[in-house]
Each structure stands twice: as structure tokens, then as C-alpha cells.
Amino acid sequence: MKLSAITLDCADPLALAAFYQQATGLEPHPKSDADFAALEGDNGLSLAFQRVDDHRPPGWPDPAVPQQLHCCFRVTDLDEAETRLLKLGAGKPEHQPNAGRWRVLTDPAGHPFCIVGGLAEPE
């Protein structure tokens, strides 16, 4: 068995796909539409987004609407990546459990995700 996609529920799949496309540089799937959009990774793993009409974004941390999954992205420079992602529309929750090693951000649909320092520059 091989993992082929991670899919996030949201109200606007194309808008959320555009955010993650700008954030990651992944290529949009050519058949993306208003109900289901995807970005394709080089390794065959897709990041996908499906429309849910009454989507309620998870909170961080919020037991009333807890996160059920989050993605972590390794970056070269935490501060630079945070600044860039905030300009793209990410949010930054007040609760940051270890801001020196990673940062918790939220995408425009409210899903928490982390950026983690330590990505080596390509040779």
C-alpha cells in the first residue's frame, strides 16, 4: 500500500490550492475544479482539497473543533518562510509551543500547519 494523497476539507478548493501552490511550488493537477483540486508532488504524493459546504475550520488549540491532521513543511529559514507565508494569506495563532524549532501557522481555510527549520540548501 502506498500513500497517494493527503486531502483537506475546505469551502473553496481552488483558492486553497492556489495558496499551497504559491507556498510550495507544487504543480496544479490539470483536472482541478471547484469541487476538488490537487497539487502534484514529484514523488507521486498529491496534496488535495475537497469542497465541504458547511466546513468548520479546526482551531489551534481548541478542543471544541480540534485539528485532526496537520502537515509539516521543512524550510531553510523559519523567519523568512513565516514572513512569506503570512504575506500569502496564512495566519499565525498566538499559541506557539516551540517557536525556535517550528512555527504553527494556519492556511486561509483555517487548517493548522507547521514550518520546521533545517532544510539544507541544494548543492
Where are these regions (language model features)?
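N-terminal beta-strand motif that seeds the catalytic metal site of vicinal oxygen chelate
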Residues: 1-18, 22-23, 68-73, 116-123
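Core segments of cupin and vicinal oxygen chelate
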Residues: 4-53, 81-83, 87-95, 99-101
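Short secondary-structure boundary/capping segments
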Residues: 38-39, 60-63
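Active-site beta-strand termini and strand-to-loop segments that position acidic
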Residues: 39-42, 105-108, 118
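A short, acidic/glycine-rich surface segment
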Residues: 54-60, 123
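Mid-chain, well-packed structural core segment of small domains
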Residues: 63-86
